[in-house]
Amino acid sequence: MASLRKTHPILKIVNDALIDLPAPSNISFWWNYGSLLFLCLIIQIATGLFLAMHYTSDITTAFSSVAHICRDVNYGWLIRNMHANGASFFFICLYLHIGRGLYYGSYLNKETWNVGVILFLLVMMTAFVGYVLPWGQMSFWGATVITNLLSAVPYVGNALVQWIWGGFSVDNATLTRFFAFHFLFPFVIAAAAVIHLLFLHETGSNNPAGVNSNADKISFHPYFSYKDLLGFALMLLALTSLALFTPNLLGDPDNFIPANPLVTPPHIKPEWYFLFAYAILRSIPNKLGGVLALLFSILVLMVVPILHTSVQRGLTFRPLSQMLFWTLVADVLILTWIGGMPVEHPFIIIGQVASVLYFMLFLVLMPLVSWLENKALRKPIELA
C-alpha cells in the first residue's frame, strides 16, 4: 500500500515539493537562499503580527506606540528588533539569491525569473511602507520624498501623489493606508512565492555546472532538507546576535526623533538596502529621468534572459564574464555607499559614473563579452 504522503491530495503536493523532489546532486550552498528567504518571510509575518497587535496607525500615537512596545510589552523590544533586523536579513538573502541567479544563468528559467523580479519589487514596496510606520523623522521625510517622485508622471502626476497621500501632504490618511498595505503585502508575497516555486518545479533547479542534471538526481529529503536546516541555524544565529547585541546598527538615528513636518533632516536617505537604487535616482538631474532610472534599475533584471548571448549557461567556465560579474558586485557596493553620502563633490560624479556603468554592464558589456567568448570557443579553421 502506498504511503499516505503519496496519496493524500494535500500531502501529495507537499511531498512532491519538499520530500521526493528530484534535485541535482551538485548544488552548492548558493541554492540555500530560496529556503532562507522563506524563513525570513515566516519570521517577518510572525513578528509583524505581534507588533500589529500593539501598534496604532495614527500620527498622534504611532511613535509612542512603538516606544510602548519596546518598554511595556513582554519581549516587545525583542519582537521589534527581530522585525527591523529581519528586514535587513531578508534583503541580504534576496541580493545573494539574485546574484546566484545571475552568476549561474538561472534566469534562463524565464517564468521563474520574472516572477522573482516581481517578488523583488513587492518586497521593496513592503519594506518602504513599513519604514514609514514608526513615524520618526526619517519615516516622514522618506515617505514625503519618495511618494513625491510620482509627481514626475506626465499629466496625472500631481493627482496621483495626492491620491496616494489622501490629502495635500503626508498625513494621518497616509499612515493609515501604509499600515494597511504593510499588513497585506506579505501575504501577497507568500502567494507569489508559491507561484515562483511552482514555475521552478516545472523545470527543476539549475546547478553550478550549468548542464542538464537529469542523469544524476537525488531526493530533496533528507539531503537538502538537512542542508537547509543548517542554513536556518546559521541565519537565526546571525539575526539573533544582531537583534540582541547591536539592534540599531543598521537603522538611522534620525528615526528616534518623532516626525516633524517643520524640520527637515540634514540628509534624507532610505534604509541601507535601497541606497543603490537611491544613488541611481539622485545621479540624474532630471526628475522624470531619475524616476525612470530608479524603476529600470530593478526592471533591467527582466531584460537579462533576452540579452543572454552565450552558448554556456553559467559563468563557471567564462573568466571574462566572471570579471564583469564581480565588477557589477563592486559597482552595486559603490552605489550603496554613494546613496548614503551627501549630494556634493566628489560623490555626485562617482554616483553618475557608477550608474552609467551599472546599466552598461547589463545592457552592453555582458552580452558583448559573452558573444566574444563564443567566438573564442569556436574550432579554428584548419589550413590545407
UniProtKB/Swiss-Prot annotation:
The cytochrome bc1 complex contains 3 respiratory subunits (MT-CYB, CYC1 and UQCRFS1), 2 core proteins (UQCRC1 and UQCRC2) and probably 6 low-molecular weight proteins. The keyword Amino-acid biosynthesis does not apply. The chain crosses the membrane at residues 33-53, 77-98, 113-133, 178-198, 226-246, 288-308, 320-340, 347-367. It is found in: Mitochondrion inner membrane. Belongs to the cytochrome b family. GO terms for molecular function: metal ion binding; ubiquinol-cytochrome-c reductase activity. It comes from Anoplogaster cornuta. The keyword Heme applies. A ubiquinone binds at H201. It is a multi-pass membrane protein. Binds 2 heme b groups non-covalently. Heme b b566 binds at H97, H196. InterPro entries: Cyt_b/b6_C (IPR005798), Cyt_b/b6_C_sf (IPR036150), Cyt_b/b6_N (IPR005797), Cytb/b6-like_sf (IPR027387), Cytochrome_b (IPR030689), Cytochrome_b_C_euk/bac (IPR048260), Cytochrome_b_N_euk/bac (IPR048259), Di-haem_cyt_TM (IPR016174). SUPFAM superfamilies: a domain/subunit of cytochrome bc1 complex (Ubiquinol-cytochrome c reductase), Transmembrane di-heme cytochromes. Heme 1 (or BL or b562) is low-potential and absorbs at about 562 nm, and heme 2 (or BH or b566) is high-potential and absorbs at about 566 nm. PROSITE patterns: CYTB_CTER, CYTB_NTER. Heme b b562 binds at H83, H182. Its main location: mitochondrion. Keywords: Electron transport, Heme, Iron, Membrane, Metal-binding, Mitochondrion, Mitochondrion inner membrane, Respiratory chain, Transmembrane, Transmembrane helix, Transport, Ubiquinone. GO terms for biological process: mitochondrial electron transport, ubiquinol to cytochrome c. The lineage of its organism: Eukaryota, Metazoa, Chordata, Craniata, Vertebrata. Its cofactor is heme b. GO terms for cellular component: mitochondrial inner membrane; respiratory chain complex III. The gene is mt-cyb. This is Cytochrome b. Component of the ubiquinol-cytochrome c reductase complex (complex III or cytochrome b-c1 complex) that is part of the mitochondrial respiratory chain. The b-c1 complex mediates electron transfer from ubiquinol to cytochrome c. Contributes to the generation of a proton gradient across the mitochondrial membrane that is then used for ATP synthesis.
